[in-house]
Amino acid sequence: MMFRLTSVSCFLLVIACLNLFQVVLTSRCFPPGIYCTPYLPCCWGICCGTCRNDNSSLTFLQFCLPFFFFLRPSHPLFLLLPAR
């Protein structure tokens, strides 16, 4: 019984350590020009599919509008644009 309890607790400890390493190793940001998502953020600037520098006080849509013009109407990101 003691061997089983020890092996189970070691197994759970290994799983907890692996989860901790995953969080530590994936908590990073990306420089300009690299692909980004809300879960893989930019170090600075705005994520418009790729990280872009924001050197002004532009809003998200003003800054990302050139990127959105290249999207097809069936693309999910196209729905973020205001109705015309």
Curated annotation (Swiss-Prot):
Role description: Inhibits the vertebrate voltage-gated potassium channels Kv1.1/KCNA1 and Kv1.3/KCNA3.
Q: Where is the signal peptide?
A: 1-26
> What keywords is this UniProt entry annotated with?
Disulfide bond, Ion channel impairing toxin, Neurotoxin, Potassium channel impairing toxin, Secreted, Signal, Toxin, Voltage-gated potassium channel impairing toxin
Regarding tissue, the record states: Expressed by the venom duct.
How is this protein annotated for GO cellular component? extracellular region
**Taking the first listed entry, what is the main subcellular location of this protein, grouped into a coarse class?**
secreted
Protein name according to UniProt: Kappa-conotoxin-like Im11.3
The reply to whether 4Fe-4S figures as a keyword in the UniProt entry is no
Name where it's found: Secreted
Q: What is known of its domains?
A: The cysteine framework is XI (C-C-CC-CC-C-C).
Name the cystine pairs: 29-43, 36-48, 42-51, 47-64
- A single MF term (Gene Ontology): potassium channel regulator activity
Pro-region residues? 71-84
- Answer whether the UniProt record assigns the keyword Ubl conjugation to this protein: no
Q: Which family does it belong to?
A: Belongs to the conotoxin I2 superfamily.
